[in-house]
A protein has these predicted regions:
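A glycine-rich, basic-preceded beta-loop-alpha segment at the flavin cofactor/substrate interface
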Residues: 196-198, 235-251, 256, 266-297, ...
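A short core secondary-structure module
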Residues: 187, 191-245
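A structural-propensity feature for long, helix-poor, extended segments
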Residues: 133, 142-145, 149, 444, ...
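C-terminal helix-coil-helix/basic helical segment that borders enzyme active sites and/or dimer interfaces
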Residues: 359-398, 504-520, 541-558
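Internal maturation/activation junctions in enzymes
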Residues: 126-130, 141-183, 193, 369-388, ...
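Amphipathic, small/basic residue-rich leader segments at the start of a protein or domain
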Residues: 1-124, 148, 583-584, 590-600
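C-terminal amphipathic alpha-helical interaction region
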Residues: 99, 459, 474-600
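Alpha-helix capping/hinge segments and adjacent helical runs
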Residues: 2-5, 10, 182, 259, ...
Length: 600
């Protein structure tokens, strides 16, 4: 039977041959685990995803939430799926045993979550949003806030959201207008409007805890004047019981291109002047707090994009194997049977491109999860700091590269199915529509490119970048031991050398105040940087594949050869194409920057 969510063999390759998941069990936090417990968690995730989430993915899409009597109504299949997720303990997969969690490494929890993201992106979003909100309260909330709001979220009784966007302020959060007035009892009264709030209303939980950005009366201008508040749908009494309905109104639902099973809400806070909120962290420090949740969300968005690309790839692969059509160019006899389309060279090209994109991005997402484990469990402060610097640098890539190129994989999946791919009778068009959100939310490509080039590269004296260059060089040195990888290694080395030169020039210009010209083509820089990182990850996979082939296991030979062919494609087809973008960056080309509004 074909696998539809992800390749279990590829997952095992990543966990146990590339990323050394078993090595994490040597660390104190994960000492109670071993490969058997890891595999058991993955098996449980796969079973729940296949049984509860995948079956209603299409129904979710065809029956988006309805607005009735001030409430959002979902299809009935969503709640049992989410309940199964909660009952299996996945909401707290990475939390400690003492806190009621599985104490899994983030690497393993992300491997588990990947099955749900592939099976049903929309229904999966509800618990995922809750995890992010809970982590925020755990990091910055008071003990009272943790008891009143965090514990019910950990227990799965309360769900959470992230409420940032306003009708006039999307990426530009410094312009938000939601206000918070202090009240005599130490709480605050909020007034404002938020839009595009995923999970902003539903009946999946007893309560919904909104994490809301707002400004205090004395707030300084800009991002330094933003504060963070807990605003529950229902107030919570001191004994933990639910109190009165808070002054939070569901004003309406947005009707989206994809992710139709997730409520996208417009929320009004304080229409009646009595929206109660509680300050989280220090006044005017809300955005720095929220960035923790946003960075977690950005990594989650990247993995979500990967898995939608993965689902489309697997479906189109099965289709190509089963769909007979035409004959090979050298066949001159029309009486011969048609061949499966997978035998045609151009179909192979499209499948190989998908494989290179989704498996390269899958590796990167899991590598980022492994880095997150390193930030908390490596032995020394220095080691943990280095892991954090590298993860911080890579976060824009983890979010944006899969969002762009796994979406392209979805496009190729549609093309492989031809006319069938363009119909709603086949799932690949939904995968594309669902994935089209990922380049937009949690920071657009443009925002990610500015973050990378304008902030992350030079952060801490370029510590993260120096680490990355060193790691790529170490991989290249190991690849030199495999002469068959020379043709794969050399294009990456050439790209890294030129990228370093371009980066130094751009950072020098930025330091000299040439901000507009330096950042004008940041989107091109993001693409090249991302291809460099993915190229590095593919060279790592190629080394492991060579080592696997050397063991002589016949059953694995096709798998490893497929890895090497995908690495060959990416490193010899995709990586060299980046030199065109680098030439534009080197020239500080102002074609786009110099375009005037009235010329359009």
């Amino acid at each position: 039977m074909s696998e539809t969510l992800l390749s279990s063999r590829n997952l095992a390759f990543e966990l146990y041959e590339v990323l050394d998941a078993e090595g994490l069990t040597q660390r104190e936090r994960f000492a109670e685990h071993n490969r058997e417990t890891f595999d058991a968690a993955i098996s449980t995730a796969r079973n729940i995803a296949e049984k509860y989430f995948a079956p209603h993915n299409r129904k979710n899409d065809e029956n988006e939430p309805r607005y009735e009597n001030g409430q959002a109504i979902l299809i009935p299949e969503v709640k049992p799926a989410v309940d199964a997720f909660l009952e299996a303990g996945f909401l707290n997969a990475a939390r400690s045993f003492e806190a009621g969690g599985m104490q899994l490494p983030t690497l393993l929890s992300q491997a588990c979550f990947a099955h749900f993201q592939s099976a049903n992106a929309a229904s999966t979003s509800y618990p995922f949003l809750t995890m992010g909100a809970a982590n925020l309260i755990e990091s910055f909330g008071t003990e009272e806030q943790k008891q009143r709001f965090l514990q019910p979220m950990i227990d799965g009784r309360f769900f959470g959201t992230m409420a940032l966007t306003e009708p006039h302020a999307g990426s530009s959060l410094s312009d938000i207008r939601t206000r918070a007035e202090p009240a005599a009892d130490g709480s605050y009264r909020l007034k404002g409007n938020k839009i595009f709030i995923s999970g902003g209303d539903h009946s999946l939980s007893e309560n919904i805890v909104h994490m809301v950005l707002a400004k205090l009366p004395d707030a300084p201008a800009g991002v330094k004047g933003i504060s963070l508040f807990i605003v529950p749908k229902f107030l919570v009494n001191e004994d933990g019981s639910l109190g009165a309905r808070n002054d939070v109104l569901l004003a309406g639902l947005f009707h989206k291109m994809g992710w139709r099973g997730t409520t996208s809400t417009a929320l009004n806070f304080g229409d009646n002047g009595n929206c109660v909120g509680y300050l989280v962290g220090k006044p005017h420090q809300g955005l720095s707090c929220m960035f923790q949740m946003m960075n977690e969300a950005r990594i989650g968005v990247g993995m979500g994009a990967v898995m939608l690309g993965y689902a489309g790839y697997l479906y189109s692969l099965d289709y190509a194997r089963e769909r007979p059509q035409g004959r090979l160019p050298d066949s001159k006899d029309p009486s011969t049977a048609p061949v499966a389309i997978i035998q045609h060279a151009d179909i192979k090209r499209m499948l190989l491109t998908q494989k290179a994109y989704v498996e390269g991005a899958f590796d990167l997402g899991l590598y980022a999860a492994r880095l997150f484990d390193d930030t908390t469990t490596l032995q020394t402060d220095t080691e943990r700091k280095q892991a954090h610097e590298l993860l911080d640098l890579l976060t824009p890539i983890v979010k944006s590269w899969p969002s762009e190129f796994c979406l392209k994989a979805n496009e190729l999946a549609i093309q492989i199915l031809g006319g069938h791919g363009y119909t709603r009778e086949y799932p690949v068009e939904q995968y594309y529509r669902d994935n089209r959100l990922n380049p937009i939310h949690e920071g657009t490509h443009g925002i990610q490119s500015l973050d990378l080039l304008g902030r992350k590269l030079a952060q801490n004296g370029g510590a993260g970048l120096k680490q990355l260059i060193r790691l790529i060089a170490e991989t290249g040195a190991r690849a030199q031991k495999h002469p068959s990888l020379t043709a794969l290694r050399e294009p990456l080395e050439q790209l890294v050398n030129r990228l370093q030169s371009v980066t130094i020039g751009l950072l020098t210009d930025l330091a000299q105040g040439k901000v507009n010209s330096s950042l004008a083509n940041s989107a091109l820089y993001l693409k090249v940087f991302g291809h460099t990182v993915i190229g590095w990850r593919w060279l790592e996979q190629a080394i492991r594949a060579e080592e696997g082939l050397a063991k002589g296991e016949a059953a694995d030979a096709a798998f490893y050869k497929g890895k090497l062919q995908a690495a060959r494609y990416f490193l010899t087809w995709e990586v060299p194409s980046c030199h065109h973008e680098l030439a534009i960056l080197e020239a500080r080309d102002d074609t786009c920057l110099g375009m005037q509004e009235e010329w359009f």
